[in-house]
Amino acid sequence: MTTPQPESRKGLILINTGPGKGKTTAALGTGLRAVGCGMKVLMLQFIKGSWHYGELDGVLPFGENFILKQMGRGFVKVGGAETDPEDLRLVEEAWEEARLAILSGDWDLVILDEINYAIGYGMLDPEKVATTLLERPEMVHVILTGRNAHAKLVEIADTVTEMREVKHAYQKGILAQRGIEF
């Protein structure tokens, strides 16, 4: 492997996908690393919104350097239900905020948490997302999370990581643990 030259540095598109847990957690870890290196981070959660997750308080000490916004109402399309118009409206609002943030260049890293679900449920056009990612300022990094990443986004991404479950405590009847899984 050759050593990257300074002129080869650029903003990256990263995707955390797959059926295993840890996609959001990995993105948060990258966000923490970025803040530690003096970068500004915006994380928009497209689906989460009705629960109070630990990361909401975890980023508070970073002030304006790490902003996390829940944009949804929580679970959508549960049990094969039709898309609720309110959920669709919230995804559209989240996407517009994400698009403007990415294109503004005000953020070094923009994390689009659970965007793959919004795309997979037909709530957001993957072509719109791809176009914005390709038009972003050169040094803006973007992370997309959620299962079943769309093929178009995988194609344009620089790094794609697929999480897979090998073993999960839930299989032993152990419920999700606050501070570890939410």
Give the location of each predicted region.
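Phosphate-binding/switch region of NTP-binding enzymes
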Residues: R147-F182
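Hydrophobic/aromatic ligand-binding patch that stacks against planar heteroaromatic rings
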Residues: R33, G58, T132, K152-L153
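Short, glycine/charged-enriched secondary-structure capping and boundary segments
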Residues: G29-T30, L56-V59, D84, L124-K128, ...
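Conserved nucleotide-binding/hydrolysis micro-motifs of P-loop NTPases
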Residues: I47-W51, G74-F75, N116-Y117, N148-A151, ...
